[in-house]
Swiss-Prot record:
Family the entry assigns: Belongs to the somatotropin/prolactin family.
A single BP term in Gene Ontology: growth hormone receptor signaling pathway
Protein name: Somatotropin
Species of provenance: Cyprinus carpio (Common carp)
Residue numbers binding Zn(2+): H38, E192
Major place of residence: secreted
Protein location: Secreted
Gene Ontology MF annotations: growth hormone activity; growth hormone receptor binding; metal ion binding
Keywords from the UniProt entry: Disulfide bond, Hormone, Metal-binding, Secreted, Signal, Zinc
Domain of life of the organism encoding this protein: Eukaryota
Amino acid sequence: MARVLVLLSVVLVSLLVNQGRASDNQRLFNNAVIRVQHLHQLAAKMINDFEDSLLPEERRQLSKIFPLSFCNSDYIEAPAGKDETQKSSMLKLLRISFHLIESWEFPSQSLSGTVSNSLTVGNPNQLTEKLADLKMGISVLIQACLDGQPNMDDNDSLPLPFEDFYLTMGENNLRESFRLLACFKKDMHKVETYLRVANCRRSLDSNCTL
């Protein structure tokens, strides 16, 4: 009888610990989604401020540029379209999100310079810090998803082909400034989508529609 009580106590403690971890992970997921939503909204505001500062003819010219433009993050392997995103595992979506956020940590220091006379960004270090905080949160979620298993992602320590891809942008160059902002908005939209689907995957919901 005593052994049964001890066993039941161990099982109960284990369940409580697992519930606590699940609750912590859910809070982390919710926080990550909120943070990337804020970054996506900020990116949209920045590009709107930039476009508002342009002459009508400049706007028409730039609207034709970005659909044909290349972003450095295009080198990061990611799902092609909604169907593939919905079929991707939670771990895969978290890893892609991690790499996308990581790719902007350094270039983000140049972002505020692309929007003149705007209070959208404020201190450029704040944007970099927001990205670093989100990256750290996603890293914790990845470790929780691995649950003690080794990280087999071979791309974790691989830099993008052009680490300084964005560094020449944003300084007295209309096209490149627009391209920088458009790429940032595009990538934050990707991360927001991936984290939303990953969060849905975690809840075992089979209807993770976009």
